[in-house]
Amino acid sequence: MMNRFRKWLYKPKRSDPQLLARFYYADEELNQVAAELDSLDGRKDPQRCTLLVSQFRSCQDNVLNIINQIMDECIPQDRAPRDFCVKFPEEIRHDNLAGQLWFGAECLAAGSIIMNRELESMAMRPLAKELTRSLEDVRGALRDQALRDLNTYTEKMREALRHFDVLFAEFELSYVSAMVPVKSPREYYVQQEVIVLFCETVERALDFGYLTQDMIDDYEPALMFSIPRLAIVCGLVVYADGPLNLDRKVEDMSELFRPFHTLLRKIRDLLQTLTEEELHTLERNLCISQDVEFPIRADVQGPAALAPALSAPLPPEGPLSAKAKDPDAELACSMQYDDQELEQLSRMVHRAGDEMSSLLSPPIACQSPAHRPGAEGSPGGEASPGRPRLRSGSDEEERVFFMDDVEGTAEALARPESPAGPFGWAGSTWADPQEKGQGGPGGAAGISLPASEKEEDLSNNNLEAEGTDGASLAGTSSCSCLDSRLHLDGWEVGADDAETAEMIAHRTGGMKLSATVIFNPKSPTSLDSAVATQEAASEPVAEGMDGGPHKLSTGATNCLLHSCVCCGSCGDSREDVVERLREKCSPGGVIGASYAAGLAKASDRAPERQEEAPPPSEDASNGREPKAPTSDKCLPHTSGSQVDTASGLQGEAGVAGQQEPEARELHAGSPSAHEAPQALSGSSSSTAGSCSSDKMGPEAAPAATHAAPQATREKIRSRFHGSHDLIHRLFVCISGVADQLQTNYASDLRSILKTLFEVMATKPETDDKEKLRKVTQTLRSAALEDCALCQETLSSSELAAKTRDGDFEDPPEWVPDEACGFCTACKAPFTVIRRKHHCRSCGKIFCSRCSSHSAPLPRYGQVKPVRVCTHCYMFHVTPFYSDKAGL
């Protein structure tokens, strides 16, 4: 009864501007909405329930904002520190955050659990309960004080506010940290490095003319796409020691680029092969906001291995020629991703994926022996005990665009599964060459082709070969991602392996395809590829001299010739092949470090394998070379270690002394030996291996080291059909990475670009300052001579300091009504209709038209807007026209 009487007697007015009075009515409104929400059945009237919940959240925001103002006024020196708020993302820091935290605390205190945050919810529940209790105590103390004295803050109320402020700050940090990632100081430092990289990129783009200063000053929307793309290029090749330094640990990279570490490494290797003009062409294409085409430049010649492929156009019936002639296949990633462009890009990517699948598996019309049943008499058709099988599962790695789909299969096929082969090659791989060569027409090693079909197949693939040796020679460029056990006399691979390749090709769509098509899988750097073996020259000669029916089908030959499209198996020129054979087969050759553990097992089996091979002199006299164990021509590296071939293994086991004379005899004596390198150099797909310096003789090491960069560059570039193809695929991959940042890291990228625009925007020059000073002087001349405020010399900062200290000035004296019969500004006489109005700023009398503005006057203690004249509003109230308040 006493409280009701006190409430009726001391209840503050609704129009009272004091904080306690405003809190009282805001709290009353919150209680009313809460009571109505409790009494409402949400199932009967869901719309009304939704409306009340929204209103309830709004009332909570209002109450907390007023409490925050009271704490600023009551305990300004005792506020809990909130420096951690700078680590919150921009979308979190808004005015409604306090209300959301209150709502979340009540839900947690009631027993609710944040979705996918069970552990964090259980850890925060005690704090949430304590926070809600403290908030109720604060509300009760403020309500009670509002009914007593609006101008007094008791010590009890101050203590309640301090306790609540500490709890609320602690809960804010815990709740936001559980919901969104909060950066550490190290991550902020790395992000600042990225900002510096972006600024340097824009500075370089301005110097080269890629961008204009007007685009930056106008905040051109296309820059949201152009700048990240250019930053990737600059970070990889121009400022290689910056935040995109791939030689550092992955953990030290910015979280923006950390998921793309593998892809960025391969992009960097390709960027390093570009000429300066090609780099400028790529950067210009990355800046434009329309579909781009990559013309073939006449001044930049492709590598020697690509000369025949570029000179002769592909026929329309070839699978790759259809891709090259299709304009959609050359569609570049545009910066403006509207629905139509996304649909076109999706169609193009899936079409390329279908073509990829056709490359990975032979055409149905020309079914290869790999898809034939194993009952046709071929030794490879049966499942040998040593045949490697695909493993059901592989180690989970950080995959970018699912690039490892293909390389995972290659690794699984290369892993040892039985003691029969220490390196995963066993069974029919080591079979007697005579057994393979005398299979007869009925063998399933391959199908013979008429001469016309052979010539047509060779011409379709731009292969310069003579006679019938070209069809069998095409098999020398087989690669691991297509078939781990391809032989020149047939495809000895199980149906499971081929089906797995088809499944991988079917999955390889979207940006996954671009990463798989362009780069050699599982290669630490594109400079280190696979190592060519002696079979590159020896086996084609054997097949050519044999003249047997063991020829690849048209589909198989077509697939093998273009195997570089799917795994990057590329080749050397004629001289490189012969030189590599000499260096590779030297007596001083050693095996790679990654396979050192297998040497012990291999050496135990070396005598048996040596007996299987016929003597080299006998084979040389017959025009045939001994069959070395068939191995992958483009076996990918793992963990940066060198991968040796089976011929190198045999040389280490004791046959290396015989291999060097054989290689030289092959080069000097046999006519077919000259055809093999020539055909290899003319094909668009040849071996991309590189011999490391430790496998060469001492006299050849310095020269090879000197020529290594240029040779490696040519090997990498030979994987592409030309400069335009390389630039186009780099454009697609770089755009894919940069545009992913817009989706995955929108907040960080927005913060980086915001800082970038603040730094790179045009600063006001001296001339602009002079113009501003002249305008200010002109406006000052319009000041009234009889205005006391215009004659003051106090600056705005001094007035602000006086206002902050609470030293309010006395309002000006009003001019008496009877002393003025005209408007001070327009001199219009006052009538019954045109009434008098006093300006609260200067105290003079004006008509309603000349005093139509309202503004607060903090220097006089007026917090709410009051009537002021036009002159005071323009020159004394708002700071837009002068740097002094006392004009």
From Swiss-Prot:
This is Lateral signaling target protein 2 homolog. Belongs to the lst-2 family. GO terms for biological process: negative regulation of epidermal growth factor receptor signaling pathway; negative regulation of epidermal growth factor-activated receptor activity. Keywords: Cytoplasm, Endosome, Isopeptide bond, Membrane, Metal-binding, Phosphoprotein, Ubl conjugation, Zinc, Zinc-finger. Residues 681-693, 700-711 have a biased composition (Low complexity). Pfam families: FYVE. Residues 602-612 have a biased composition (Basic and acidic residues). Residues 638-648 have a biased composition (Polar residues). A zinc finger (FYVE-type) spans 817-879. Its main location: cytoplasm. Monoubiquitination at Lys-87 prevents binding to phosphatidylinositol 3-phosphate (PI3P) and localization to early endosome membranes. Zn(2+) 1 binds at C823, C826, C847, C850. GO terms for molecular function: phosphatidylinositol-3-phosphate binding; zinc ion binding. Negative regulator of epidermal growth factor receptor (EGFR) signaling. Acts by promoting EGFR degradation in endosomes when not monoubiquitinated. It is found in: Cytoplasm, Cytosol; Early endosome membrane. The modification Phosphothreonine is found at T516, T870. InterPro entries: FYVE_LST2, LST-2, Znf_FYVE, Znf_FYVE-rel, Znf_FYVE_PHD, Znf_RING/FYVE/PHD. The FYVE-type zinc finger mediates the interaction with phosphatidylinositol 3-phosphate (PI3P) and localization to early endosome membranes when not monoubiquitinated at Lys-87. Gene3D superfamilies: Zinc/RING finger domain, C3HC4 (zinc finger). CDD domains: FYVE_LST2. Interacts with TRIM3.
